[in-house]
Amino acid sequence: MEQTDGEILLEMNHVKKSFDGNGVLEDISLTVKKGEVVSIIGPSGSGKSTLLRCATLLEKMDGGELIYLGQTAASEKTDKNGRVQCEYASKAELHKIRKCFGLVFQNFNLFPHYTVMKNIIDAPIHVDKVSRTEAVARAEKLLAQLGLSDKADAYPYQLS
């Protein structure tokens, strides 16, 4: 999935999401092109986080369409009973799509029950499908560059 200038990176069309019958996102559409900066502003409880969670495939939409770099991640389908639902791409396709974006969480924390090493190698193993041996080698190199080799087996609460 290559990016070109002016290319549409993300499209969300007529997105719907509800929790326990409470409509949180109702017919939301947006397009983000390469180079654009987008702000999502609204009061607490207005659906900002839910929209972002749907856009990044952390939350499943109830309806609508989600497209990354021209590749459909989810699209609205009507079943034989007339119910509208989202049909998602295969796990393999979603894996490729997820590699197109990154997330920075507002309250970033390490997993407290993982060692430093496990925190570092978890994403490469599960997201990039890197072998454990390769992930550990990369992590050891990174820790050495940072002067933290002695902290590989420490837990987050043990770090200053």
Q: Which residues are covered by each model-predicted region?
A:
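Conserved ABC ATPase "signature" region
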Residues: 71-75, 81-88, 132-151
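Conserved ABC ATPase signature
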Residues: 154-160
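ABC-family P-loop ATPase nucleotide-binding domain
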Residues: 1-16
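Helix-to-loop junction immediately C-terminal to a conserved catalytic motif
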Residues: 56
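Short coil-to-helix segment of the ABC ATPase nucleotide-binding domain corresponding to the Q-loop/switch region
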Residues: 114-122
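The feature captures the beta-strand-to-loop junction immediately N-terminal to the Walker
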Residues: 41-43
